[in-house]
Amino acid sequence: RRSSDLQEYFERMGTDPTRWGKPFAALLGALDAQLDLNIAAIGGKDSMSGTFEKMDVPPTLCSFAIAPGKASEVISPEFKEAGHAIRLVSCDPHDTAALTANYDAVLSAIRAGKVVSAWALGLGGVAEGLFKMGIGNQIGTRIDDDYDGNLFAQQIGAMLLECTEDIDLGVKVGDTVPEWVLEYEG
């Protein structure tokens, strides 16, 4: 069963209504996400006293989530071998049905041994993921000439997958190569 925990830090509330609205909006958004994804926040720490003398902390809501599973089904992010297909799985992050369908499809592909590494995209987008996935085993990437995605765009909820075969999931970005390079002609 999946669950999460929340910890929030917010500036001194005072009498400014907008300051009171920030924690309300953040926690309402967290509740919406929990309901949409069928995940409960089973605990939390109230750190709303995020102040020191006259200083305020930036408004922050942290979520810690777990999804217990079998150790044999856990994969790491580094590329495993040259000659594998690299695919990008993404969708509108506000479409929770599509998001959970993607996650379920990726989990099935992992269980079938077709996905051997994965990277959740961050602020640096596809380019960051490809670079960091290659570091561990010094395996490179050759991006397909016809890949037309933005290499640096932030894509919330998207994942790069290293596949042992070219599966029908997401879009193909390229292939892993034995040289530790990041090649793109496009």
Question: What spans do the regions from the language model cover?
Answer:
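Conserved structured catalytic cores and adjacent interaction surfaces
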Residues: 6, 10, 42
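Glycine- and other small-residue-rich loops at beta-strand/loop junctions that grip anionic moieties
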Residues: 52, 64, 78, 95, ...
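Glycine-/charge-enriched secondary-structure boundary and capping motifs
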Residues: 19-38, 42, 46-61, 108-186
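A general structural motif
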Residues: 64-70, 93-103, 142-145
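Acidic/histidine-enriched ion/cofactor-binding microenvironments in catalytic or ligand-binding pockets
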Residues: 55-60, 70-89
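A glycine- and small/hydrophobic-rich beta-loop-beta segment
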Residues: 80, 85-118
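Short, small-residue-biased leader/transition segments that mark boundaries at the very start
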Residues: 1-3
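Catalytic palm subdomain of template-directed nucleic-acid polymerases
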Residues: 9-22
